[in-house]
Amino acid sequence: MTLARRRLLALALPLAFIATPGAQAGVGDLLVAPTRIVLNGSRGTEIVLSNIGDDVATYRISVELRRMTGNGSLDDVVEANEREKTAQSMILYAPRRVTIAPNQPQTIRIAARAPAGLPDGEYRAHLLFRAVPPPRPVAPPSQARGVSFELIPIYGVTIPVVVRLGNLQAKVGIANVALASSNGKPAVALDLTRAGDRSVFGDVRVFKAGIKEPIAIQRGVAIYTEIETRHMVIPLNPALATSAAGPVTVDFVESTDNGPVSLAETKTVLR
């Protein structure tokens, strides 16, 4: 059997978003800033895409749904509940497909329009920027023998879009702090708990008395409203790992427009 055209098999490779709202998420030759959108009310904002590659690149933009699990991973939603459907439908953005020249930026406008009578609360979806592969030349019939496949990676960047309606509150707790290992290296394990009607997003830090910098830190930690507890294992700073045992202070500092705000702190002894 001869095919004159190669059949292309696309492999999607999603990327988890980077920690801080002011940072840039990147995959391939695409940078996205900011990496997290919070919309309060009807006022919108902008996202800047930057093509840092040497070739023209095209990206398709779509609204996707993800659910967080207890270990912090984000799973695709197969069957959306009513809240997720509402979140997906209220997010407005333009354009939905962009072609960006090398070393040039592109602005995406984004806003949310809540349906009349929608209850106060937090609604979240995720914006996916997926690369569109350039067209491939068709092999001449004389060169196409049998069935051939070509794997073309399709890269994507996903960022959360959080819509908040009303005066929402959240409380965070830190529990079960203990020494652990991550990929065979020393680490700190702990559980973050969340209560309230909104998500939280910030940094987890572990301090030892007399040492200025954290002996362990995890930036950009989110706890979304679908979970109440998130388990974490944070690698220790290799230069400070030998002094980890003993009394420590662990805190969770949320990133806000007005600077970092401490939401939780606990003192314990690492054993």
Placement of each model-derived feature along the sequence:
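Bacterial N-terminal signal peptides that target proteins for export
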Residues: M1-L11
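Bacterial N-terminal signal peptides
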Residues: A10-A19
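Short acidic, flexible loop segments centered on an aromatic residue
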Residues: D54-D55, Y59-K85, R130, T193, ...
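Beta-sheet-dominated interaction scaffolds and their linkers
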Residues: A25-V56, R97, K171-K185, T193
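Short, solvent-exposed loop/turn segments enriched in Ser/Thr/Gly
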Residues: N40-E46, Q106-T107, P119-H126, G184-V188
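Intrinsically disordered, low-complexity segments enriched in serine, threonine, and glycine
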Residues: A180-R271
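Terminal connector regions
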Residues: E64, R113-V162, T242-L270
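Intrinsically disordered, low-complexity Pro/Gly/Ser/Thr-rich segments with frequent PxxP/GP/PP motifs
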Residues: E79-A116, K212-T242
